[in-house]
Amino acid sequence: NRELCSSNPEGMFVTAFAVIFDKNSDSFLYINAGHNKPVTVSNGKAEFLECKPCIMLGVFDDARYVVNSAEFGNGDIICLYTDGVNEATNADNEFFGNERLVSACQNAEQTAKGVCDGVYDALTDFTENAEQFDDITIVAIKNSKNRD
């Protein structure tokens, strides 16, 4: 953050969600720097990870970022995405929104690829190929104890 602030005459900023997984304790540590709340899927139920975002990177060089933790049991999935997903619009200028995002995660095949594909397919069906003006990025990670 300090480096970005010191070499940023244009005043640009970036959101970020940093995560460290601990496979020994079925949990993860994370910092949310102004990014969208991730969706977690546990036992077939999808919901937003309750986290208070800190300020975006590149805004204040003395910003403090709080490290939080969350449970991440065997079979759980976390889905990270850019705002181009929930802010995607259809031909009627309606947003895809958070409710559709959570529903897509919950109804998807419960693999990391399945969640990414499920969100993307729901998004494509909703927008009906209407032109989008922001990036659309979806990343999902599944805790699979049966794999190394």
Show where each model-derived region lies.
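Conserved subregion of the PPM/PP2C metallophosphatase catalytic domain
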Residues: 1-148
